[in-house]
Amino acid sequence: MLLELNYDFDIAALLIEIILLFFYYQRRTVPSMQTRIFSLIVYILTTCSILEIASSYCDLYLVDKVPIWIRWLIECTYFSCVNSFSVLYAVYCFLLLDLKKKYSYKKYNFLQVFLIVPYACCLLIIWLAPVLNDVYPMGFSIVKGVGYVRNHNIWFLIPYIISSFYLIITFLILIIHRKEVSKTTKYLLSF
């Protein structure tokens, strides 16, 4: 039954993430906060892969059997995890660059707010989708008998735009501080 679905990429990603977790816990080489963020990133990616498989399976085989509230929970958690990756990667890079010491207190606090506000908006859009579904469909819907349906409006694109924003900001800050980064830090950033 699983072979009828196109799970190749999800299963491959899941296996890579499990291998990463296994070898990661064999030897830790980065400080504790960075270690926590890195392990959280890998756990979130693993959760994304599992939820993607569960969502696809529910759409194809269990459309009428799984309660809609469980489907909403799966989809909202999946999109939250997908968008959390870019935020956590930005935090991971900023911790490795030790920006708290390089920036003034005011500038560093601005950077924190700059990271939190778009992410909070993104999560708000994702988790309001089931609440506002009957009034105004946001990014996606769960339709009885059909399953997951992507809405063709701007609300579907906003979480992806916010994710891209985090990756671009991280890339720009890495370029700005490229001369200050040691070889080992560059290696850690390229995980």
Set out the residue ranges of the language-model regions.
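Hydrophobic transmembrane alpha-helical segments in integral membrane proteins
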Residues: 1-19, 154-161
